């Protein structure tokens, strides 16, 4: 399995597939926001940024999958997936244990050199409450689904990282 993951990480197909999944999840978030009119909260926006980090990592890996740039893509992938798990878990705890003393921020806090909420308010502006339960599918809230999604991204990323230390088998037609 590790040799298979090593081979996949050296080709563009797996990186582009990951980019497609992250992009479709972003489109789903925008559908919930603009079509279903669910108001994203601050934690939702941060989770969206973590997903954009995974999308960026996959595009970085697809640019040059056989070069050392692949290692930077794996590092960004792991970091973004880990932050996504942390954010989604904290968001889940806010929803499962609502308290007036335990709330999320009222406004997103992006760095002054990267004010995403000012540049793209349709994507990064927060207007909802983190503890409000707005959507449910198969008895799980949206942050609970995101815990599973980010955890899957993280497990696969760690396996791909481990596979980088496994030498791929040479595929020789005559078995030499």
From Swiss-Prot:
Disulfide bonds: 41-44, 104-130
GO MF annotation terms: electron transfer activity; protein-disulfide reductase activity
UniProt keyword terms in alphabetical order: Cell inner membrane, Cell membrane, Chaperone, Disulfide bond, Electron transport, Membrane, Oxidoreductase, Redox-active center, Transmembrane, Transmembrane helix, Transport
Pfam families associated with the record: DsbB
Periplasmic side: 32-49, 90-144
Gene Ontology cellular component terms for the protein in this record: plasma membrane
Subcellular location: Cell inner membrane
SUPFAM superfamilies attached to this UniProt entry: DsbB-like (SSF158442)
Membrane topology reported for the UniProt record: Multi-pass membrane protein
Residue intervals annotated with topology Cytoplasmic: 1-14, 66-71, 164-176
Transmembrane segments: 15-31, 50-65, 72-89, 145-163
One of the protein's GO biological processes: protein folding
PANTHER family: DISULFIDE BOND FORMATION PROTEIN B
Entry similarity comment: Belongs to the DsbB family.
Function: Required for disulfide bond formation in some periplasmic proteins. Acts by oxidizing the DsbA protein.
Name assigned to this protein: Disulfide bond formation protein B
Organism: Yersinia pestis
